[in-house]
Amino acid sequence: MIRAFSFPVSPERGRLRGWLEGSLAGLCELHWLRERQEYRVQQALRLAQPGMGGAEAEDEEDAEEDEDAAAARRAAAALEEQLEALPGLIWDLGQQLGDLSLESGGLDQESGRSSGFYEDPSSTGGPDSPPSTFCGDSGFSGSGSYGRLGPSDPRGIYASERPKSLGDASPSAPESVGARVAVPRSFSAPYPTAAAGAETCSSAERRARAGPFLTPSPLHAVALRSPRPSGRVPCGSPDGAASRPLDGYISALLRRRRRRGAGQPRTSPGGADGGARRQNGARPRPPEASPPPGGARPAREPSTERAWAAAWEAEVPPEPAPPAAASPPSSPAEGRLVKAQYIPGAPAASRGLPGRAARRRAPPLTRGRSVEQSPPRERPRAAGRRGRLAEPSGRRGSPRARKAARSQSETSLLGRAHAAPPPKYPTAERDEPRPPRPRRGPAPTPTVQACRRWRSTAEIDAPDGRRPRARVPAPRGPAPSPSAPPRRLLYGCAGSDSECSAVGRPVPLGRRMPSGCAPGGYGESESSASEGESPAFSSASSDSDGSGGLVWPQQLVAAAGASPSGPGGAAGGGTPAGPAKVFVKIKASHALKKKILRFRSGSLKVMTTV
């Protein structure tokens, strides 16, 4: 036996099945009522006829009555045949409802409550008593309508077996009825009261008592407890009564099914293509709108939907169902995201985007890549937005996504960043890259240096009237250290993930040379032109020009007696430096230089891992 209704479904689906059953029973009821009304009209017309001869009229009237009774019996037999075939029809409807693939939300309910064909526990009569009846407020249950309207054998249809159609409707044994009276009934079918079971006469006895037509009509009981949410009584023409019980609910159900996911954030650039949605929108999709884990479900309209759609097609404006609502995208381009730079793990240059497009990501540093593998960055288009310097009020710029990669030895330095004392060589930096400039040239004008990330000490001194000494490529020797102004000094070059490691000449402790001087001026490492020209490194200038290195005072501890070495050591006004300071230029990537500048304490042991 096919165990069709033994799986749990949502209450909505059970209610839909109940309303379909009610509509079918209403159709049969209307046909039956029409036959009864025709019979009554013919009776009234015969009574209103002018009198014929006495015996002749009586004989003719008896013959007409026999004729009418035979016609009524034929109509009742045809109706019973239709009612016999009705369970099989509702079985087919249940199968098509299963093909609708409604979302089963009520998995916690009992497995038997999925359909309206259940035995009424109150009908405990003999084997030919109907399972439930249309009397009083009993409402309409699926099995009750058949037991009331059909022949004398009961038709209790259970959750575990197929409803008996016309071919296999056999009289049930008494123990089969008594054994299954406790099967739970549907949510959709209104429960009959105990008074419903008191009437134990079969439909044959009732037909013998009340003539060929039953009174009161079962349609009256359907109207008393209509399960529709609108609560309208199915009245009016037969067509109207057939379609009205369904137009409110089924149209709303189909609209909700077609419109599912319409309020969710769009994450694909296409319009209403209905492709598989990627869950990266502004807000997460609610779990009931997410597609089922069992795979794609075909969004099709079965014959049930087409059969009942004709009634409400004129009222409800048609909404286009998404054609490919559940098909996954055939290529990555179909399901691509709106913001492609949020795909993790792909560098910005490999996706063909400029470096500034990746600025919205904010991982502090990408780890694990060596400096040689980092591709050259291109920043030609962001020049118009880079006019402001960050306020020199102690704010260190937020970490940017365009930092170069660091090696594993650099990663080991991260843990000590927070334990460092206050900075000794503070920086004035900006949040954004700067436009490309020629490799060598005169000292930058204030407009040019406003667009640069780092400013040298010489450039900081320039507004105060101090003329910086030109750098001469001479062998190292002692040099006096004029006082540095109490401003935030710059101690590294931003754009240079440079690989040049020429050992520079000694430089005063608190100062850096102007960037426009001779080959080896520190400003050249800041130009994007030098970064773009050397493809071997991420943004490196060559070793020959000596630019881009990080100047580090290795005799800082020895200078503690001559110049103040506290946090204000670099800004100690007017204090001349003592013996010669040896400065070493370190080959460092941009990320490493940024990290070194965070470690600006007196301890140089940090640098042993470079």
Swiss-Prot record:
Protein name: Dapper homolog 3
Listed Gly residues bias regions: 566-576
Pfam families, alphabetized: Dapper (PF15268)
UniProt keyword annotation of Coiled coil present: yes
GO cellular component: cytoplasm
Sequence ranges of Acidic residues compositional bias: 56-69
Sorted UniProt keywords: Coiled coil, Methylation, Phosphoprotein, Wnt signaling pathway
Organism: Mus musculus (Mouse)
Tissues in which the UniProt entry reports expression: Expressed in brain and uterus.
UniProt gene name: Dact3
Keyword Coiled coil: yes
Region of interest (Disordered), residue spans: 50-76, 102-179, 200-579
Residues recorded with modification Omega-N-methylarginine: R255
